[in-house]
Amino acid sequence: MDDWKSKLNADSLPWLLEPDNPSVRHFTLRDLLGRGKDDREVRAAKAAIPKSKIVREILAAQKPGGYWEEAEKKSWPTHTYVALAILAGHGVAPNAKIKKGVEILFRNNQHASGLFTWTGAKSGALLCFTGDMLFVLGHLGYADDSRVRQARDAYVAQLRAKSDLGCSRNANKPCLWAAIAALRGYAALPPNPAARDVIDHLANVLLTHKYDFAGAEKPWLRFGVPAGFDLIAALDGLAHFGFARDKRFGKLLDVMLGERDEAGRWMCRSFNTKFVVEKRGAPSKWVTLRALKVLAKCKS
């Protein structure tokens, strides 16, 4: 499992294993070093996650009603979604407070069709949003919830119907971010053979696109926390579903590798202003972890 390290220009693993960020340490031990869930250090790192500063801050900011910042309403739940996305990404086990927030998203933002919507109406079910929600809910332990299964199946139908990935918020132009969101969402759930044709199509869309990282796709190199629609997210989804051996993948991987510094770290170039996880313009443990996980998936 260690041969992926040959791609590194420096070993950043000791840095990722430092105890100041137990979530990063936990994922590094588990996903990069291959430690099992019963490993003593893995268990210790996981137990420390709820005590970390950012997790405590986010949970402390939750309102008694279960939402964050804005009152509960049928609209895009910016703060609530972001809070839960960060908690999910940090590997926080769902507790009563988190479950209360999740129920608000189900109640206000899942349409009867199963899709998740910004507005409560089906017209607000953008191609990227259900994928984002599947990612969060899958990582929070809701993969087997009937509402998530309904969303999963409705999302397959939506993506088949809009195979051109036209986005209503962008003059109906193809939205590669939707492809990233979908791959990321389905990667967080148990394998679903019924979705394989859609996954293959989305992967092909990402692999055949003519990228201009100095122009239109420059924002794809603005890696940040929580993970957004960027090159690392695209590569992670592609690698998860078995496309790492594709030559076109290799070219994109070289672009990602070109963004590391001399110490083998990647920078945080974007962050969410509602809950600041890391400092912009500084080496990022989270971005570095994400990049190294892509390499590990390529070699696994």
Regions found by a protein language model. Give the residues of each.
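Preference for long, amphipathic alpha-helical scaffolds in soluble/luminal domains
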Residues: 1-300
